[in-house]
Amino acid sequence: MSKKTVVVGLSGGVDSSVAALLLKQQGWNVIGLFMKNWEDDDTEEYCSSRQDLIDVMSVADKIGIDVEVVNFAAEYRERVFAEFLSEYQAGRTPNPDILCNSEIKFKAFLDHAMQLGAEKIATGHYAGVREFDGKFQLLKAEDGTKDQSYFLYRLNQAQLSKTLFPLADIYKRDVRKIAEAEGLHVAAKKDSTGICFIGERPFKDFLSRYLPPKKGEIRRLDDGKVMGEHDGLMFHTMGQRKGLHIGGIKEKGHPGGGDHDAWFVAGKDMEKNVLYVVQGHDHPALLKGDLVAEQLSWVSGNEPHTHWVYTAKPRYRTSDQPCEVERVDAESCEIRFAEPQWALTPGQSVVLYESRVCLGGGVIR
């Protein structure tokens, strides 16, 4: 009986390397696929794709699998990067990794894998998938500190039905141990962080290449007093503290703030090009008990129940927050939290959970 084929997305990191290794050990015919999604900056010091490809080839040779290199740069620019720029231009703070997953890694990559005759695709994401009651569920990973289901909430039934997540039940520390035991040189390789196409370069420098910055006033939200000058609204996001250059100003008697309390971004007026700030982490303007989300995507294809207790992540690095869905239709949904949330950020995604099951979510308005 011939082996079933799985195409594994290899990034050059330890997670995808171990995912490929485990599938090989489980008896799959494994093909590695290295995706090249960005190509303008390959000569620059910040781009790591060359070294990543070298690492992929080394790992593939060690575990005995073939690797194909595929260029999805055109698809990436059209489906992910154009949206990224559009969102920043509109004053929001997008999360391109979410779009990259649904449009590139689990669409362009999936289509290519199927053309190669594969039954499944696999990645090194920390998440799980299971079939339950005739539907495929997206699950949180066993390692809660590394769980990446937040970034995968836009995956649909067709995508999940073809997907394997070999690291679903494995802790990161054990992934590194497996790599070390098998002699994979990427065992101690540092995790990649930040937005993939920006790499380690300064964000402001990168964005300025594509969107011309426009200076404007920084005003205090409470009374409109001018506090300074910003170098472009797109460089600032809700709750931001660093980079405002107004930290030394003493102001008394404003909600949430004392004499020396830090200043935080509390809003933007795109038409007037004004950045609004407040003093103090606990200023009421930074706390909100509800939100409206748009561009909804539900994993099962079914909307969540209204007035049912769920949990939600209004940003990636936050603990699950108890909430209810007040209203939901095809266009938007309203989510009310049990406790006010700090610095809810337009453009970021809010993702809904029922226990370990990721239900889906949308983009905060």
UniProtKB/Swiss-Prot annotation:
<protein>
    <recommendedName>
        <fullName>tRNA-specific 2-thiouridylase MnmA</fullName>
        <ecNumber>2.8.1.13</ecNumber>
    </recommendedName>
</protein>
<dbReference type="InterPro" id="IPR046884">
    <property type="entry name" value="MnmA-like_central"/>
</dbReference>
<dbReference type="GO" id="GO:0000049">
    <property type="term" value="F:tRNA binding"/>
</dbReference>
<feature type="binding site">
    <location>
        <position position="35"/>
    </location>
    <ligand>
        <name>ATP</name>
    </ligand>
</feature>
<comment type="function">
    <text>Catalyzes the 2-thiolation of uridine at the wobble position (U34) of tRNA, leading to the formation of s(2)U34.</text>
</comment>
<dbReference type="GO" id="GO:0002143">
    <property type="term" value="P:tRNA wobble position uridine thiolation"/>
</dbReference>
<feature type="region of interest" description="Interaction with tRNA">
    <location>
        <begin position="315"/>
        <end position="316"/>
    </location>
</feature>
<dbReference type="Pfam" id="PF20258">
    <property type="entry name" value="tRNA_Me_trans_C"/>
</dbReference>
<dbReference type="GO" id="GO:0103016">
    <property type="term" value="F:tRNA-uridine 2-sulfurtransferase activity"/>
</dbReference>
<feature type="active site" description="Nucleophile">
    <location>
        <position position="100"/>
    </location>
</feature>
<keyword id="KW-0547">Nucleotide-binding</keyword>
<dbReference type="InterPro" id="IPR046885">
    <property type="entry name" value="MnmA-like_C"/>
</dbReference>
<feature type="site" description="Interaction with tRNA">
    <location>
        <position position="348"/>
    </location>
</feature>
<keyword id="KW-0819">tRNA processing</keyword>
<feature type="active site" description="Cysteine persulfide intermediate">
    <location>
        <position position="196"/>
    </location>
</feature>
<feature type="region of interest" description="Interaction with tRNA">
    <location>
        <begin position="146"/>
        <end position="148"/>
    </location>
</feature>
<dbReference type="InterPro" id="IPR023382">
    <property type="entry name" value="MnmA-like_central_sf"/>
</dbReference>
<keyword id="KW-0820">tRNA-binding</keyword>
<feature type="region of interest" description="Interaction with target base in tRNA">
    <location>
        <begin position="95"/>
        <end position="97"/>
    </location>
</feature>
<feature type="site" description="Interaction with tRNA">
    <location>
        <position position="125"/>
    </location>
</feature>
<dbReference type="InterPro" id="IPR004506">
    <property type="entry name" value="MnmA-like"/>
</dbReference>
<keyword id="KW-0963">Cytoplasm</keyword>
<dbReference type="Pfam" id="PF03054">
    <property type="entry name" value="tRNA_Me_trans"/>
</dbReference>
<keyword id="KW-0694">RNA-binding</keyword>
<feature type="disulfide bond" description="Alternate">
    <location>
        <begin position="100"/>
        <end position="196"/>
    </location>
</feature>
<feature type="binding site">
    <location>
        <position position="124"/>
    </location>
    <ligand>
        <name>ATP</name>
    </ligand>
</feature>
<keyword id="KW-0808">Transferase</keyword>
<dbReference type="Pfam" id="PF20259">
    <property type="entry name" value="tRNA_Me_trans_M"/>
</dbReference>
<dbReference type="GO" id="GO:0005737">
    <property type="term" value="C:cytoplasm"/>
</dbReference>
<feature type="binding site">
    <location>
        <begin position="9"/>
        <end position="16"/>
    </location>
    <ligand>
        <name>ATP</name>
    </ligand>
</feature>
<dbReference type="GO" id="GO:0005524">
    <property type="term" value="F:ATP binding"/>
</dbReference>
<keyword id="KW-0067">ATP-binding</keyword>
<dbReference type="InterPro" id="IPR014729">
    <property type="entry name" value="Rossmann-like_a/b/a_fold"/>
</dbReference>
<comment type="similarity">
    <text>Belongs to the MnmA/TRMU family.</text>
</comment>
<keyword id="KW-1015">Disulfide bond</keyword>
